[in-house]
């Protein structure tokens, strides 16, 4: 189903698919569910809700689809690179800022055995906050990496996905939007091969593809491959997609996503 109202901020915004909004919400809830069970895991491959991390890949696919659908046909008329980046900044960065500020506050008041935020200097927390506000990754082992577990954004761990979201948007605006559908298909295939090779070789060291949240080892490479494949696949889908009406589509898709993400490791 489509919502025919447009955003007040952008008068030329296209109608959006409410179904995709709903599925994004379902995937977000599944990520929370995944991380709750992660706290009870005995190993990287025993996380109860084992493939919940793939919801991030679903987000990347959705982002690619929405960006392609919303902007592909505007570049020859009203859209330029500056305008595109302005729109995406307005769409994405409020979440970065809000998450960083809330993360800093909760870090300063927490006092659990695992991470006692009261034992970290305020100056380092403020430095971590500043880096997070500008989406600059913290260097593992540095003072600004206040949790000490190698995260790019220790005050708000999920910001790593927005870091790659920005990379996807930059690649789209500067290069990928100019690709023909055939060239885009080739890119998707090559990215899929790269991601599959990463998985088969277990470069993550975890036995799965839950990577991208750290600068350590091959983590950054894995995150980039996840982004490149999923975001490009979403862009390709936006070009070849033909809308059809399916009764109960939201529930069918929601159940399918939940089942796929809960499949145990073999």
Where are these regions (language model features)?
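Alpha-helical transmembrane segments and their helix-entry boundary regions
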Residues: 20, 83-84, 92, 161, ...
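Functionally critical transmembrane alpha-helices in membrane proteins and complexes, commonly lining
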Residues: 15-74, 90-100
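Aromatic-enriched alpha-helical transmembrane segments of multi-pass intramembrane proteins
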Residues: 124-266
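Membrane-interface helix termini and inter-helical loops of multi-pass transporters
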Residues: 42-47, 112-118, 206-216
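Alpha-helical transmembrane segments of integral membrane proteins, especially early/N-terminal helices
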Residues: 13-26, 122-123, 187-191
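Transmembrane alpha-helical segments and their boundary/interface "anchor" motifs
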Residues: 53-56, 73-113, 118-135, 168-169, ...
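Membrane-water interface at transmembrane helix exits
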Residues: 37, 68-72, 103-107, 176, ...
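Short, Lys/Arg-rich, polar N-terminal cytosolic tail immediately upstream
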Residues: 1-19
């Amino acid at each position: 189903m489509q919502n025919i109202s447009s955003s007040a901020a952008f008068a030329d915004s296209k109608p959006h698919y409410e179904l995709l909004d709903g599925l994004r919400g379902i995937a977000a809830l599944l990520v929370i569910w995944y991380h709750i069970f992660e706290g009870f895991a005995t190993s990287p491959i025993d996380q109860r809700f084992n493939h919940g991390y793939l919801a991030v890949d679903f987000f990347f696919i959705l982002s690619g689809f929405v960006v392609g659908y919303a902007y592909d046909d505007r570049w020859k008329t009203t859209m330029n690179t500056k305008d595109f980046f302005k729109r995406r900044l307005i769409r994405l960065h409020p979440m970065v800022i809000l998450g960083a500020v809330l993360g800093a506050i909760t870090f300063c008041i927490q006092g659990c055995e695992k991470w006692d935020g009261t034992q970290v200097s305020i100056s380092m927390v403020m430095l971590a906050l500043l880096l997070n506000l500008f989406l600059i990754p913290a260097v593992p082992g540095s003072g600004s990496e206040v949790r000490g577990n190698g995260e790019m954004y220790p005050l708000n761990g999920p910001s790593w996905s927005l870091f790659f979201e920005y990379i996807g948007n930059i690649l789209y605006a500067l290069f990928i939007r100019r690709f023909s559908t055939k060239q885009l298909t080739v890119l998707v295939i090559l990215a899929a091969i790269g991601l599959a090779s990463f998985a088969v070789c277990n470069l993550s060291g975890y036995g799965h593809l839950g990577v991208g949240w750290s600068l350590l080892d091959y983590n950054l490479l894995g995150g980039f491959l996840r982004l490149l494949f999923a975001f490009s696949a979403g862009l390709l889908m936006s070009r070849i997609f033909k809308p059809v009406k399916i009764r109960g589509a939201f529930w069918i898709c929601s159940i399918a996503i939940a089942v796929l993400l809960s499949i145990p490791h073999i």
